[in-house]
């Protein structure tokens, strides 16, 4: 993802070689990757892609990790058939590319996914998790959908306007200290404004020494020094879902 005022490169990081536990389905007008929980507890989590798309193995790995913790997970194609960002692409064209993939205009897709989860997966309790571009989607959804019980926004760009602080349900925000995409000043502003305006539970957590994408685009076995932070962030994500979904 990139700063809204000045879009800039987002490194794809370590792309995992991962096949996945789930399968692809058609959900009304969009495709999606679905993984059923080994235990059907009536709980589901929507997992929202970053700019590299719904088929990125890293995102599917995260969805499967969540599924192993008792949730049916779904990774919808929120780009609705449009191409994801190509890591080898010309970054000068990124602002135009991003404009046609507005993370705050996804209600039609969210509504379709909610219908699918309730009708086909018998989900009664639903949460949402998103990374980078998907973190913005989570923030938007948590201000608009009171029936989504919990959200985790992982390094999503922050827009400073009154409506983004009116969260409907508990939301966890995860950031990286050395994120060149999201300045710490933005994180501080978010923290202060939530303190002033938000009436539901929330947490803003910044991980020391980490960079943009560390939770889902770093291989912990290749970065031993980062492994504790990656594991802690993933554990926090699951704990938040367990507590509020």
Curated annotation (Swiss-Prot):
Enzyme class: hydrolase
Residues recorded with modification Phosphoserine: 223
Alphabetic keyword roster: Acetylation, Cytoplasm, Hydrolase, Phosphoprotein
Compartments, as annotated in UniProt: Cytoplasm, Cytosol
Gene3D superfamilies: alpha/beta hydrolase
InterPro entries per record: AB_hydrolase_fold (IPR029058), CMBL (IPR042946), Dienelactn_hydro (IPR002925)
Principal location listed in the UniProt entry: cytoplasm
Documented EC number(s): 3.1.-.-
Catalytic residues, chain numbering: 132, 179, 212
Modified residues (N-acetylalanine): 2
Gene Ontology terms: cellular component: cytosol
Top-level taxon of the source organism: Eukaryota
Molecular-function annotations in GO: hydrolase activity
PANTHER family: CARBOXYMETHYLENEBUTENOLIDASE HOMOLOG
Function according to Swiss-Prot or TrEMBL: Cysteine hydrolase.
Family: Belongs to the dienelactone hydrolase family.
Name of the molecule in the record: Carboxymethylenebutenolidase homolog
């Amino acid at each position: 993802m990139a700063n809204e005022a000045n879009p800039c490169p987002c490194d794809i990081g370590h792309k995992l070689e991962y096949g996945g536990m789930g399968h692809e389905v058609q959900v009304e007008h969009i495709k999606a990757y679905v993984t059923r929980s080994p235990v059907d507890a009536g709980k589901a989590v929507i997992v929202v892609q970053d700019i590299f798309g719904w088929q990125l193995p890293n995102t599917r790995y995260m969805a499967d990790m969540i599924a192993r913790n008792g949730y049916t997970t779904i990774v919808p194609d929120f780009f609705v058939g449009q191409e994801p960002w190509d890591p080898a692409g010309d970054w000068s064209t990124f602002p135009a590319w991003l404009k046609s993939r507005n993370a705050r205009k996804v209600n039609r897709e969210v509504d379709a996914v909610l219908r699918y989860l309730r009708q086909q997966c018998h989900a009664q309790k639903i949460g949402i998790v998103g990374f980078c571009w998907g973190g913005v989607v989570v923030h938007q959804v948590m201000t608009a959908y009171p029936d989504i019980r919990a959200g985790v926004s992982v390094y999503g760009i922050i827009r400073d306007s009154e409506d983004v602080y009116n969260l409907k349900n508990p939301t966890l925000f995860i950031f990286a200290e050395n994120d060149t995409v999201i300045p710490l000043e933005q994180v501080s502003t978010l923290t202060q404004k939530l303190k002033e305006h938000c009436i539901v539970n929330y947490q803003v957590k910044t991980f020391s020494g980490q960079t943009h994408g560390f939770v889902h685009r770093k291989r912990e076995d290749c970065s031993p020094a980062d492994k504790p932070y990656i594991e802690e962030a993933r554990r926090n994500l699951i704990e938040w879902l367990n507590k509020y979904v």
